[in-house]
């Protein structure tokens, strides 16, 4: 990527430079001086002793030579360790079910000062209007909220019904927006490898920025071809050797630890002094309960240090500087002169205990963020409105006919992974030859009046009841899993009535439900309220059987055709390895 991209983001006037230089020389008064602090050296390792002086949004100087520097305000760090603000290299804020405003309130006090966001969830539902709203939120945010322009809406052409398109012409209209860092994950990797001109046109249009990848399990000549097209990174790696090979071929590796896809344990052993500038941390999809109880990028850093013995400076490097360099955000990622003053003060660097956060040179107050949240959300003009164009359903809509002696395909879930296996099961008069088979259905919600696409699901752990949601990647149709058609219908009708959301049904009754009024994806509740509601949903879901740790996030990926092996879209069963539809009955 061309380093000149930094000029797009690093806006500083000549007057600001002169003021900054004057403070650096010791000829002018700083705005803030952070004293009694040690600075973690991400380049050499070890620590730098001495103050940090700040003028405006930027660091003017670091080190003992500024011990007596004049400043308008002094911050006593009380022996804390200072590190750069954390950066999430790839996420979909919508998957937190929070608005970008609420997400900032929940994560900025945890040290997450920068996010690289792909808003393709809301773009799949409402098109350019969704992207425009995210841009408005980013413009007013204290947090550095950067956007990658969604590249695959829908995820795979012709495989699902979604709510809107996002054409190249529309994408280009956002390319020069000050918050746009590049092109979001190019999920149609077979199309890129085969040289489809429509996809190459998108890559060419954003080649001077950053080109995000998406290629789970890809190897050999296909991986070489994908990288040849200009793809620069991947967040979908889930095996050690897969990650190593991508690094060898020049890709940057995003190590993901989300609520469903948990790849940190598999990939953390790769990180070392040599390759850490090419390694980054990301969450992709993380729900509000985990953010509240475990953390965000801070939780990933903690695990690298405590569970994988990654040296402190390397762990914090991959959480900040590596990502800033990759995206051309050269004003971020280091505590050094001329860099933006995004600073996290840690009372315990090994446990990632956040004491105080500064962003753009100003201390962050969590209570102020909470108090201003409602007004700032209203200022962003959220795109309210019911996006569920689906009539209520009945149990007969989920009726499947099976023939004794026949074999049927089953989507087999792998807990805490996005990939699935494709297995089969024989049906007899007593049912299937395995007792963990549930029913799954996907119902398009955009007014096409299609019959539900139905299939079989194994390994999910559902012993009774039903779960339904409008969070269903990436087209966000209605997905429902159940043991009976009656309870599946009840769950679906509840989310239709709510205008989108999540629902748990058991014993013929709705046990818990969460309305998501923005695009059927996001709530307008506070982060704390949302976490409590998620807690109630998870508790209700656990009564239905030994489900995955995050059942709704795991369920949401069962309809995403660009991740192998077997998925179900509104169009039917899809073989994610052959990239073709297949039948429920095994006929070969």
UniProtKB/Swiss-Prot annotation:
Family, similarity comment: Belongs to the metallo-dependent hydrolases superfamily. Adenine deaminase family.
Q: Which UniProt keywords apply?
A: Hydrolase, Manganese
Any Pfam family from its record, for instance, is Amidohydro_1
What's the name of its gene?
ade
Q: Provide a Gene Ontology MF annotation, just one.
A: adenine deaminase activity
Does Ligase appear among the keywords?
no
Cofactor list: Mn(2+)
Question: Single Gene Ontology BP term?
Answer: adenine catabolic process
Q: Which domain of life is it from?
A: Bacteria
Annotated S-S bridges: none
Q: What is this protein called?
A: Adenine deaminase
